[in-house]
Amino acid sequence: MADLSPAPALREGGPRAHRPSAPSPPPRSRSTSEPEEAELSLSLARTKTRSYGSTASVRAPLGARVIERHVEHRVRAGDTLQGIALKYGVTMEQIKRANKLFTNDCIFLKKTLSIPILSEKPLLFNGLNSIDSPESETVDSSFCQEEEPVVSEEELPPPSPQDPDPKPAQPEEVSARDFLQRLDLQIKLSTQAARKLKEESRDEESPYAASLYHS
């Protein structure tokens, strides 16, 4: 008969069968993974755009600071919250949050709406100041101010010659004294003319009267 007894157990400390272990994965280089992750995050930040109706915030690219400014919109007949949001490039939720509106039809309860608009403001790096230092903010604010165009005198067009408008002759102001003097002079001249005319008529009649007297 065959011996069916179990095989004797191996003694402790005895030789064990060597099991082949799975090969360990090669260590991941940290220097190569960090630039890839940074490039991936930067590309996601650039390609991520705001979709209409979403409440997700827009991630600004590196080296930029998001500034929120409000624009006043006058509500007119026929305006809709969707149309206003499309006009200014914002979401309806942002308009409702800024104006404390509960429904889309509440815009007609107000005469004007405050529209929040996000604008990106670049940061300046001069190698000495940090991003949040007051010096960099001062330089940044002065850099972002709109410069007025300077026009030299040579570029100015010559003034077009304009004919002076002929002004109507204003009547000469005459004082009361001058008026009375002129009136006296006219009366005096009229009197002299009448006297001269009377004398001439008398001289013409005198020869005719003398001839009648002698006849």
Swiss-Prot record:
<feature type="modified residue" description="Phosphoserine">
    <location>
        <position position="33"/>
    </location>
</feature>
<feature type="region of interest" description="Disordered">
    <location>
        <begin position="135"/>
        <end position="176"/>
    </location>
</feature>
<feature type="modified residue" description="N-acetylalanine">
    <location>
        <position position="2"/>
    </location>
</feature>
<dbReference type="InterPro" id="IPR018392">
    <property type="entry name" value="LysM_dom"/>
</dbReference>
<feature type="domain" description="LysM">
    <location>
        <begin position="71"/>
        <end position="115"/>
    </location>
</feature>
<feature type="modified residue" description="Phosphoserine">
    <location>
        <position position="24"/>
    </location>
</feature>
<dbReference type="InterPro" id="IPR045030">
    <property type="entry name" value="LYSM1-4"/>
</dbReference>
<feature type="compositionally biased region" description="Acidic residues">
    <location>
        <begin position="145"/>
        <end position="156"/>
    </location>
</feature>
<feature type="modified residue" description="Phosphoserine">
    <location>
        <position position="5"/>
    </location>
</feature>
<protein>
    <recommendedName>
        <fullName>LysM and putative peptidoglycan-binding domain-containing protein 2</fullName>
    </recommendedName>
</protein>
<dbReference type="Pfam" id="PF01476">
    <property type="entry name" value="LysM"/>
</dbReference>
<feature type="region of interest" description="Disordered">
    <location>
        <begin position="1"/>
        <end position="40"/>
    </location>
</feature>
<feature type="modified residue" description="Phosphoserine">
    <location>
        <position position="57"/>
    </location>
</feature>
<keyword id="KW-0597">Phosphoprotein</keyword>
<dbReference type="InterPro" id="IPR036779">
    <property type="entry name" value="LysM_dom_sf"/>
</dbReference>
<feature type="region of interest" description="Disordered">
    <location>
        <begin position="195"/>
        <end position="215"/>
    </location>
</feature>
<feature type="compositionally biased region" description="Basic and acidic residues">
    <location>
        <begin position="196"/>
        <end position="205"/>
    </location>
</feature>
<keyword id="KW-0007">Acetylation</keyword>
<feature type="compositionally biased region" description="Pro residues">
    <location>
        <begin position="157"/>
        <end position="169"/>
    </location>
</feature>
